[in-house]
Amino acid sequence: MPKKTYFDEKAAKWDTLIENEVILRLKTMLEELALPQGSKVLDLGTGTGVLIPMLIEAVGLSGGIVAIDFAPQMLAEAQKKYQWPNLEFLEGNAEDIPLADQAVDEVVCNSAFPHFDDLGKAAQEIFRVLKKGGRVSVLHPHSREYINDLHASLGGAVKNCMIPEADVMHAVFSEAGFENITIENVSQRYILIGRKL
């Protein structure tokens, strides 16, 4: 089964699978990122939009959110829930982001990066759409090991969707042009941050 079909078929019930504790972890991670008021943020791999209310709260009405996903039914679920004047939904792939060069200040990618078909190309595209001084944040509300074990156990379309080792992830983003790359991998969170200087 193609990954797009896998996520489209699960879209209607996706939100019921997200535990409250996971939402709280994501809120904490976003608070630590301290997204500047007024910034334009790309939510890459938005899914059903779990981060959208948190992002809107962070950037305020003077900021903006572009939420992109490759699975149209996941996007449809997000659009049912959220309408703000500074929120835009786009269907698209991480390897070919439908935005102009230097379009956003921040790219946040929650629980989506290992699902991209070409991680190197996705990192290059993230770099392209970020403004100079911009930041990428790859988030998971679980450890790398937990995510990889989960995907392996689920099998099917996601069985090979793995977060690479830290040195590989560092190389993927460094080769795309990012600097000041940091990776935190602990029991209840995984965060990679990089800057376009």
What are these regions (language model features)?
Residues 177-181, 185-197:
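Core SAM-dependent methyltransferase catalytic element
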Residues 95-106:
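A short acidic, Gly/Pro-enriched loop at the edge of an enzyme's catalytic core
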Residues 120-132:
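A short glycine-rich, Lys/Arg-flanked "PGG" loop and its adjoining helix->strand segment in the class I
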Residues 42, 48-96:
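Class I SAM-dependent methyltransferase SAM/SAH-binding core
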Residues 161-176:
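Short alpha-helix
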Residues 1-37, 50-54, 73-77, 137-161, ...:
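Conserved class I S-adenosyl-L-methionine
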Residues 106-118:
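A short SAM/SAH-binding and catalytic strip from SAM-dependent methyltransferases
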